[in-house]
């Protein structure tokens, strides 16, 4: 796992911490998928899990997103335990899943409008299209997009709700090396475009 420097050595207040995890465990039958993770992530930080297949990266992300229950430990995301979170909390998250399921007959613009309709305060669709670099494909049907362009649309769908926090699970799957470098270079811009907490 690669991440931020040890936050205990920095002057970080609780208000700046958006993810706090202590002793996170997840057991699936006889297999301990996650074995005692501790971490803190501060607002504006980009944090990554690195490891081989089966190391528990996706399981950990799904616990933080509230899609899976943990077996043990303490977890707070945006000040809330994901296992107890409601709709308002979920609206503050943007999620790019490991694999996508886009509507192939919608255009990029239509897809973003559809998903934006699920949120109380969506971002401007044109702004999101520009942010993810799909301006020339805004009116193209999803089925005509390359794999990398579809992943950029996945990112746009995660950002259209104007989230406070974005989770990316293997977001550059399907990208060629050049597109991958561009995506990672744009990550700080995406992080800085997240809305401040209210």
Q: Can you describe what each PLM-predicted range is?
A:
Residues 65:
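Helix-to-loop junction immediately C-terminal to a conserved catalytic motif
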Residues 73-81, 89:
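Conserved ABC transporter NBD signature motif
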Residues 113, 117, 122-138:
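Conserved ABC ATPase "signature" region
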Residues 141-145:
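Conserved ABC ATPase signature
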Residues 166-170, 175:
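Catalytic Walker B motif of ABC-type/P-loop ATPase nucleotide-binding domains
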